Curated annotation (Swiss-Prot):
Belongs to the UreD family. It comes from Streptomyces griseus subsp. griseus (strain JCM 4626 / CBS 651.72 / NBRC 13350 / KCC S-0626 / ISP 5235). The lineage of its organism: Bacteria, Bacillati, Actinomycetota, Actinomycetes, Kitasatosporales. One of its GO terms (molecular function) is nickel cation binding. GO terms for cellular component: cytoplasm. UreD, UreF and UreG form a complex that acts as a GTP-hydrolysis-dependent molecular chaperone, activating the urease apoprotein by helping to assemble the nickel containing metallocenter of UreC. The UreE protein probably delivers the nickel. This is Urease accessory protein UreD 2. It is found in: Cytoplasm. The keyword Amino-acid biosynthesis does not apply. The keyword Nucleotide-binding does not apply. It holds the Pfam family UreD.
Amino acid sequence: MAALASVPDTLAPGSPAKVGILDLAFAVRGGRTELVERYQKTPLQIMRPLWIDPEQPGMSYVYIMATGAGVAQADRYRMDFRCGPDTQVHLTTQAATKIFRMEHDYASQRVHLSAEAGSYVEYLPDPLIPFKGSRFYQRTEVTVAPGATVVVADTLTAGRLARGERHAYRVLATDLHISRPDGTLLAIDTLRLVPGRRGGGVLGPAVFAGHDLVASLFAVTDRVPATVLADALHDALAGLGLLHGVSVLPRDCGAWVRVLDDSPIRIAGAQEAVRQAVRRLLTGRPAPDLRKP
């Protein structure tokens, strides 16, 4: 990605509206999770927190939004989420993230999420859609304290599928890094997708495997044994007819699942099935319908 860095003929990195920042902190106040610190810089912003879960009325639901139509060249986004002890937080996006065509430089997004003991945090953004010629890097760093639960997911598409556009982006690179506060590594998931370049294949069995969408979900928790969580994930997908794989994470810290398919609707259904399975297993309660189209 560094090789693509350049000064575009439009607004350069660091220009107004090119650096989006979200810095949010949550704490328990009056029996429910409240947003106690907030800093936001356009184009990133949030809706005010919602408390819409009748089963867990203290959980704060936060929708992340961007004032532009999508991510453009030379955009630099950074999001920091700090979830205090015993907080309950659900973080999601308003819609899919569109990565526009780029002629110069690249765009990046960095996410830092920390969860303290007793917290239950979900970070479940909508799919990432890379347009033809786009160049994008995303790094997600998650710090999970012992006694905390974090569920983090992502969905990558091959492009604008309705237009017949598949793997026409220039570069799509993502890193997920999950660790303990003392630095103990729990999981790493790295993707480097460079269509057309030798060694940068995108259709192999370890990537898209000939499909149009790939979705992943990692659940880190010590509320139940990792094998029990993995079995719940597998059972949630067993009857859906989608290609998927489930495995436990190291040190008995949780489990993860990856799903491949060609239908955005089926992928969304699979993500919802595993979200419900994790929520029911770990809390004994279902998750609410978020009413996204």
